[in-house]
Structures are given as C-alpha cells and as structure tokens.
Amino acid sequence: MKTLKVVATPIGNIQEISERAKKALQDCEVLFCEDSRVTRKMLDLLNIDCKQKKFVINNSFKEKQNLTFAEEFITNFKCCLVSDAGYPSLSDPGNEMINWIISKNKEIRIEVINGPSALMCGLITSGFKTTPLLFLGFLSHKQNQLKNYLSTYQNQKSTIVFFEAVHRLENTLETVKNVFKNNDVFIGRELTKLHESHYWFNTSENTLPDITLKGEFVIVIDNQNINHQTLSSNQYLVYEIKKLMDIGVKLKDACNYLAKKMHLKSSMLYTLFHESI
C-alpha cells in the first residue's frame, strides 16, 4: 500500500526531531511543504542531502488539480508531508491534502510520525486542566469578528488554546479581557526556543503583563469555571485561595503562590481572605 508520511517537525529546537522522523525525511523522494526554504534549512541542520528530493509547495491544495497532482506523486514516489513547524494539518494547509486523500483514495495510507506541538507545549506549560480542550488555531484579524467569535465560547466549559502573531498580540489580549471576565490566561512566547518565556495573568486585572513583543505566541485561557466569571475581582481572588486550600495547600502558601502568579502582594491576599470570612 502506498503511504503518505505526515511528519511533525521541531517548533524551535532542532534537537526535538525524532530518529523516526529523520529517517522518513532522509528516505523520501518528494516533500510536500509550506515553504521549501524553511524545509531545506531544516534538512541542512539535520545533515540530510536534499539535492535529489523534489519539493512541492502545499499552500494551494484547495485547488482540485493540485490535489490530483499530489495523488500521482504519492502513488509513484516515497512522500512526506511537513509543516514549517509542528504538526502538518494543525492550522496548516496540509489538512486539505490529508482530507482529500482519505475521501478519494482508500489505497493510500496516512502514517503520522509524532513530534513537537506548540498546542500541546502551551497547554501543558499553562498548568490548566487539559480536558475538555478547545483549539481555535489562528483567529480573525478583524477586531469585531474576533470578539464575536470568542464570545461564542464564553459559556463553554473548556481550556481554550489558540495561536497569535506578535503584531496582533496586545489587541487580542484586550479582546480576551473584554470577553472573559475572571479567567486565568497563559501566554507562551517562543516555546522550545532559546528565549522562551511564560506569562500568566487574570482577565480581571487592570493591566496586561509586561510581555516581550517578539516571536510567536500560544495563548491558553482557563474557562473551566464559567459559573464564577461574574465574580468581582476580590471575590475571584478569595475563590482562588479557597480552591488551593481545598486541595491541602496552607493559607500562607496559597497567598504566596497567587501573589507571584498574579503580581500581587501576599499580605493583601491574606487580609482579603480573612475579611471574607
């Protein structure tokens, strides 16, 4: 059976490539990719000779003639599908190719070779619950559409993950604050790269964290406690303290943890908790 190998590639750290992925890339004759320059650079870092390989740009797989063209390659050559970074098909035009092949040619086998994922890396680093999970990919560039789109998930109990570009980050985070009133948010910048950095804040806070506006971002919203979104800022803080104490964390430690996480004074949280009793 003919096989299309779908290969996840590093999202920043080349050392995260697996031996299985390297072998697939080395053995293949045709590479379907987003940008041949990016893929060639990756192969060069992996010491894989690409002189005899054919590179096919997959940005326009929505056109049927290109999909038919891809099918012919897969039938006659060893083929791999890659993204510029991470998993092909996740916010990537390769999804059209995989979907079309599955629906049109049952004789072609889809084989996924696992690897790095910005989605999973951001989700795990956030510390938020991992299920239910809602992945939104890249959001609309238009502010009104963005707000309306996020509002449709306001009452959906889940952890929400999406990607954002640096030039839209601040506007998007302000929109998140407008839609989600008392939610913890994680921002992962340049995940797995040399200057990787993490930020947490709550949407009830007046200001955004001091974020280095360079690189690529993963945004994670904790929307698991939707019944508490209407709480005031102080009520929310008390609720968070109690939530930690319910799992055995001492009051002092809970206040210290939240103070560090939310850039507040632990003494203020301690006083706030006692005033609520």
UniProtKB/Swiss-Prot annotation:
GO molecular function: rRNA (cytosine-2'-O-)-methyltransferase activity
Top-tier EC class: transferase
InterPro entries in alphabetical order: 4pyrrol_Mease, 4pyrrol_Methylase_sf, 4pyrrole_Mease_sub1, 4pyrrole_Mease_sub2, rRNA_ssu_MeTfrase_I, SAM_MeTrfase_RsmI_CS
Keywords: Cytoplasm, Methyltransferase, rRNA processing, S-adenosyl-L-methionine, Transferase
CDD domains registered for this protein in UniProt: RsmI (cd11648)
Catalytic activity: cytidine(1402) in 16S rRNA + S-adenosyl-L-methionine = 2'-O-methylcytidine(1402) in 16S rRNA + S-adenosyl-L-homocysteine + H(+)
Gene Ontology terms: cellular component: cytoplasm
SUPFAM superfamilies: Tetrapyrrole methylase
PROSITE patterns found in the cross-reference section: RSMI
Enzyme Commission number(s) of this protein: 2.1.1.198
Localization terms from the record: Cytoplasm
Known function: Catalyzes the 2'-O-methylation of the ribose of cytidine 1402 (C1402) in 16S rRNA.
Protein family per UniProt: Belongs to the methyltransferase superfamily. RsmI family.
Protein's name in the database: Ribosomal RNA small subunit methyltransferase I
Protein species of origin: Mycoplasma genitalium (strain ATCC 33530 / DSM 19775 / NCTC 10195 / G37) (Mycoplasmoides genitalium)
